[in-house]
Amino acid sequence: MPIGNLGHNPNVNNSIPPAPPLPSQTDGAGGRGQLINSTGPLGSRALFTPVRNSMADSGDNRASDVPGLPVNPMRLAASEITLNDGFEVLHDHGPLDTLNRQIGSSVFRVETQEDGKHIAVGQRNGVETSVVLSDQEYARLQSIDPEGKDKFVFTGGRGGAGHAMVTVASDITEARQRILELLEPKGTGESKGAGESKGVGELRESNSGAENTTETQTSTSTSSLRSDPKLWLALGTVATGLIGLAATGIVQALALTPEPDSPTTTDPDAAASATETATRDQLTKEAFQNPDNQKVNIDELGNAIPSGVLKDDVVANIEEQAKAAGEEAKQQAIENNAQAQKKYDEQQAKRQEELKVSSGAGYGLSGALILGGGIGVAVTAALHRKNQPVEQTTTTTTTTTSARTVENKPANNTPAQGNVDTPGSEDTMESRRSSMASTSSTFFDTSSIGTVQNPYADVKTSLHDSQVPTSNSNTSVQNMGNTDSVVYSTIQHPPRDTTDNGARLLGNPSAGIQSTYARLALSGGLRHDMGGLTGGSNSAVNTSNNPPAPGSHRFV
């Protein structure tokens, strides 16, 4: 009985045996002896009585296992068995399940810390999440990663009951992740500084006897208005002017000569009259104290009696002294008025001079700074808007193709039935090299070249895995990943004598990403292995005669 098309023999038309069960087909079914059926993307399964919930797993945890000893095979859950370079993640709140809940269907990496612990690190929406892996999960990840890339991807609900599958992150997965990052809106704080450059990449690829060496140098410079030093200089000038205005106001309020009071004046005539009256009254009072200054009356008996009236000469003397005092008071009032007015005028003149100097130096200079800074801001913004686009990219590509003689020997494969496999036809190397040269020298004039940033810039591709055996089925993909900036735009189907019906990715980056994905989807180039991006639930069954290409280079 044939064992199936396990040797990738195109002459054997037998399906691959059914796969072991996923945990979603075993959970909750133990002890009842029924078969488990599934029509998921990994093909039909009609299998055994599950080992979950059995006597060997009755404790429902592994804390009772002896440390350092291997786990009993009966205790292995289905998720610990790798299948098609991947395994299923259960909803068991373990490290990988926790990471999957945080980052979803995204790429994560595995790192080893100094203390020997292994952590899985993923990122989503700018938030990085890390979990400490158990030894069994780390061993499972290593078992599906023979190349040691330490990069894996959650491929969504491809397992049973919506469980996520873990596979090695292929190059197209990293490219898809970069596309998603480019399509996500950027924050305002992520603008790049002026003069930033993105590097120089060189990649050598050998394919079917032809060596194709491509060197691509890309220089990208970005600038923003906030990174322009002239803008900050203008804003600093405006700020200096505002500070000058405030300082000038404070100085004028505190340090200048205060406003003088109105001068106090006295009426000279009123002062003279008041002084004259006061002097007359005072002298008259003093004169009455001396009886000799009064007139006397002689009575009938001849006695002299004071009459109470001052003598005429005394009155005249008093009047003369009063007038002199009034005149002196008048002159004094005139002098006092003149001095008060002079003092007021001097203080007012000094204050006006200080105000003139401070206003001219303070307000004038500050206003000039504010005006100049405002003009500088306006001119800088206008020049920045005029010099758009902000991002300027210069790309220089040099391609050199050299040929060498390769002798292809057909392989004789003998299947289990005893049939003899006929030698495969040899490809013409000249036609292949001509095809590569013609497609690599083609340029398309599309708007997507200058406006779409290349998402494949940081993806390193190696098509010829040293750990994967090479067959003569001509299943190699041409010109994939020649440079760091390849966006494939041409699809070429292989010759009819090959067993791989998938499409070839050829050409120069020109036609954009969406058209390439659409053409790949229509040509079936994405339907290999586990269903790919567009494959249905029966894709693995329909391609049983066309086995997937060796290795994990598939679209996930």
From Swiss-Prot:
Residues 1-44, 182-226, 257-280, 388-449, 531-556 are annotated as: Disordered. It is a multi-pass membrane protein. Residues 182-205 have a biased composition (Basic and acidic residues). Residues 402-422, 536-546 have a biased composition (Polar residues). Keywords: Host cell membrane, Host membrane, Membrane, Phosphoprotein, Receptor, Secreted, Transmembrane, Transmembrane helix, Virulence. A motif (Essential for actin pedestal formation) lies at residues 454-456. The keyword Iron-sulfur does not apply. Phosphorylated by host kinases. It is found in: Secreted; Host cell membrane. Disulfide bonds: none annotated. GO terms for cellular component: extracellular region; host cell plasma membrane; membrane. Pfam families: Tir_receptor_C (PF07489), Tir_receptor_M (PF03549), Tir_receptor_N (PF07490). Residues 1-230, 384-556 are cytoplasmic. The chain crosses the membrane at residues 231-251, 363-383. Its main location: secreted. Residues 252-362 are extracellular. Residues 213-224, 257-277, 434-448 have a biased composition (Low complexity). NCBIfam families: transloc_TIR. Multifunctional protein that is required for efficient pedestal formation in host epithelial cells during infection. The extracellular region acts as a receptor for bacterial intimin, allowing the bacterium to attach tightly to the host-cell surface. Simultaneously, the intracellular region initiates a signaling cascade in the host cell, which leads to actin polymerization and formation of actin pedestals at the sites of bacterial adhesion. Interacts with intimin and host proteins. Belongs to the Tir receptor family. This is Translocated intimin receptor Tir. It comes from Escherichia coli O55:H7 (strain CB9615 / EPEC).
